[in-house]
Amino acid sequence: LEHELVAARYDLKHLFRLILNSTTYQRSHISPTEDSQGEENFACYPLRRLEAEVLIDALCQISGTREQYSSIIPEPYTFMPEDQRSVALADASITSPFLEKFGRSSRDTGLESDRSDRTTAAQRLHLLNSSHIRQKIEGGPKMQPLIHWSREKNEEAVTELYLTILSRFPTEEEFEI
């Protein structure tokens, strides 16, 4: 990759194109064989859940909203600037109910095992039924126009949703759904 980057005169788009079109990057998470050694032999990649901070940042990015944070320690440096993302939270005392529910580490010990990456029923219910997520979708400036489009513009709305959420165009099969 180093030689390719230099040969392309440090063109990052060229480097991204090279990586994204490689077979390594396009591997499936499904093992090509029945045995359990697919992961060990790098024949597939293991799926893992997004960390709490990354997930809320993605939801805020999609909806155009921001998360509200609070701190149990009332000190001046617990104020969060509007443009700061959850992944940049340096102080573990600054948190939100979403971060706690989705397994953000309290950073008491500094061990990786403090973070919970398990998917729980409470997390599923929060994503499916919570007023928090509903307010982000319905109240977000990015989603408002897409929600209120008329039936005549249905195909255009679906395309915009796919581009906003998945950064790709929908397939023909997805349009039919």
Language model segments and positions:
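Alpha-helical secondary-structure segments
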Residues: D11-N21
